[in-house]
């Protein structure tokens, strides 16, 4: 792609580090070298390495992956509710920038710990909160809780067409959304992208979701083209780079990694 891309959602699976079986599932290895080979030519110059349910609260793999990927890449991790400040600050120095609540698969802190943990981490290190959640399960009470956080995002377009109204209400309240995981969603990605951009073009971020663990199909290069065709030209640079770079790096010019 000619467009510079911030991959807001990728996984690195390093068998040298602990993996936790999740609902009978263990993923195949997907190393930094595998990732670089797969995205070669896509214009990716930065991204967010996201911890999956099968990695639990381990950050060893994440720190190594960020070191190997270099500038422009940050981490999204899962933490127990009782994680101490020193651990959080160590992870921040290593490049971690968000805490993830994996409601769909588990392996993260519970939603009961949502406000306390997310707010404490934001006040301490400036991190935002990310949610892997089926938007159909977001009632008005949970919507208010998520929207009241200092900064938050929703993975994979909220997963389901029936959850789109709830997702758009969050977008109206300032929550970001990742256009990722097209092989695992039950909706028309192009229609969802257009709806989000219509509400707030600064809310949308793109990503590969590689290596697409447990998805109905893996990421395809054409998934990015679907987004290109759905987004007005005037918003293209922000959707593919600027929105995510500001969210994760604090600036749309901070990504120093070279395009792959």
What are these regions (language model features)?
Residues 10, 52, 157, 208-210:
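Active-site metal-binding loops of divalent metal-dependent hydrolases
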Residues 56-136, 173-184:
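Active-site gating/metal-coordination segments in enzymes
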Residues 111-206, 214:
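Catalytic pocket-lining loop regions of alpha/beta-barrel enzymes
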